[in-house]
Amino acid sequence: MQNSGPDPAVMEAINRGNKVVFFDIVLGGGTESADGGKDEGKPLGRIKLELFVNDCPKTCENFRQFCTGEHTDPVTRAPIGYKNSCFHRVIKDFMCQAGDFVNGDGTGKTTIYGTSTFADENLTTHKHDGPGMLSSANSGPNSNGCQFFITCKKAEWLDGKHVVFGKVLGGDGGESMMTVRKIEAVPTKGNANQPRYPIRIVQCGEL
């Protein structure tokens, strides 16, 4: 995959006092191939995300630790988080949703705080005002957990209902957003808008 070293956009975000995490995305794969080897899938690219840690510290830390694997199972000490999970819902011209490493279908919830959900933190500072906004998926007020979505275009009707806690680095047209567009283009099936092929987060962490 791509070099995970800092670039100017990453350094600018860090200089603003924010943190930056990444996802390496692969389409398909993860299964045994016909010749007995492992099908690695098709790399779609890397998504770099700036986290608004000063405006949404609790939401960002929950997300960050699920990216880095710092949060672990209390019994096995195995990392708990987004690595090897999938985008489970994709709606073209709207958003791409992921983060359910609990059940994999959009029903799972957990947090680093010892509860399944936590309260809405800041619904006013940042808006769903364009593509590339990182927002907390929920099932109603104060039901934030591990799931999140990235907008594909402006979605102002979500303002005041979902916490926007970060954004895709580089803006629309940048490399990270191009990876989001590749996810957006994957065919889906059914009313749940489930991708027809697994869209996997094969690596993630903090830059």
Report the location of each language-model feature.
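Cyclophilin-like peptidyl-prolyl cis-trans isomerases
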Residues: 1-207
